[in-house]
Amino acid sequence: MERHTTLGEFIIENQKDFPYAKGELSALLSSIRLAGKVVNQQINKAGLAEILGKAGKENVQGESQAKLDVLANEIFVSTLRNRGEICGLASEELEDYLVFDEEMHKNAEYIVLIDPLDGSSNIDVDITVGTIFSIYRRISKKGTPATLEDFLQPGINQVAAGYLIYGTSTILVYTTGNGVNGFTFDPGIGSFFLSHSDIKFPKKGNTYSVNEGNYVHFPQGIKKYIKWVQELNEEENRPFTSRYTGSLVADFHRNMLLGGIYLYPQGTTAPKGKLRLLYECNPMAFLAEQAGGKATDGSRRIMELQPQELHERAPFICGNKEMVEKAEEFMQ
Ligand SMILES: O=P(O)(O)OC[C@H]1O[C@](O)(COP(=O)(O)O)[C@@H](O)[C@@H]1O
Ligand SMILES: [Mg+2]
Ligand SMILES: [Mg+2]
């Protein structure tokens, strides 16, 4: 029987891609793997462990937090705080970034941004959710506390990014700038194994993912693009199929494997869209580009946007290159 490579082996094997690396990034990816396992275990038994429902408080964006948003955040923060690979962390569920200034963190090279639980509206109804992470090398001097500047870096500075998808199976997908690979969790063994190597968007896609309930609020260009995808044109395989789960990770994963486009545009009610640039758009954009796809805000490359605030939002269009460029044409 063919033996699959474990995530741990793959991380070590690929450490050579980073001639300057001293193993910190590998150790950090392993910490994220560990936290992911713990969150996965909690999600699998959520209905029994009284961790469904609301936490009774709001995050900095005024969204009412789900108990699992809070728990997943605590698991990632405590796992990464207990291991010395990062000097700071920012999260969707925390108003401000955390500075890890204990001795073992002071000289750490990296910072992490996370969306601990993506697709929160789906938790209580057992639909696929995820965790998204983005890793940067610090800008501030080693030995000093992490600064806001360390977090407000453009997406092109990411050294690694990825997500965990908690679906029919649990898969960890990530890139370090050398392609995108996916590892499926085998609960029987308790390890992640390489199951999707060097993932690339298929040449063509015919699935579009957008919350059409917001159609009336969309800019004209997006309205026209949606009309275009729904028109009959057998040659161009239109109308496209509509698939929207309410979880960015799930829609992105499907579109990357089968071809498609995800759109969360700006609108009258959300002038800058809904998704957060630093821990949703940038990591997915890095993965998309590494898989041969594209990610824009309708006209500009997401990864070239200069962030101004920790929780700022950005219009997000991401998927097959050709499909994103068509949407951009309509936006022009
Ligand atoms: O319900 P809406 O407005 O369509 O938004 C759904 C989108 O918002 C998100 O749930 C935002 O992420 P969080 O759940 O992490 O807040 C995305 O996963 C999803 O694609
Ligand atoms: Mg999210
Ligand atoms: Mg979230």
UniProtKB/Swiss-Prot annotation:
Catalytic activity: beta-D-fructose 1,6-bisphosphate + H2O = beta-D-fructose 6-phosphate + phosphate
The protein's Enzyme Commission number: 3.1.3.11
Cofactor binding note: Binds 2 magnesium ions per subunit.
Location relative to the cell: Cytoplasm
Listed GO CC annotations: cytosol
EC main group: hydrolase
Cross-referenced InterPro entries: FBPase_C_dom (IPR044015), FBPase_class-1 (IPR000146), FBPase_N (IPR033391), FBPtase (IPR028343), Fructose_bisphosphatase_AS (IPR020548)
Any GO BP: fructose 6-phosphate metabolic process
GO molecular function: fructose 1,6-bisphosphate 1-phosphatase activity; magnesium ion binding
Positions of Mg(2+) 1 binding: E92, D115, L117
Residue numbers binding substrate: D118, G119, S120, S121, N211, Y244, Y262, L263, Y264, K274
Biochemical pathway: Carbohydrate biosynthesis; gluconeogenesis
Annotated keywords: Carbohydrate metabolism, Cytoplasm, Hydrolase, Magnesium, Metal-binding
Residues that, per the record, bind Mg(2+) 2: D115, D118, E280
Cofactor names: Mg(2+)
Main location (coarse class): cytoplasm
Subunit structure: Homotetramer.
Cited NCBIfam families: PRK09293.1-1
Annotated family: Belongs to the FBPase class 1 family.
PANTHER family per UniProt: FRUCTOSE-1,6-BISPHOSPHATASE-RELATED (PTHR11556), SEDOHEPTULOSE-1,7-BISPHOSPHATASE, CHLOROPLASTIC (PTHR11556:SF35)
UniProt name for this protein: Fructose-1,6-bisphosphatase class 1 1
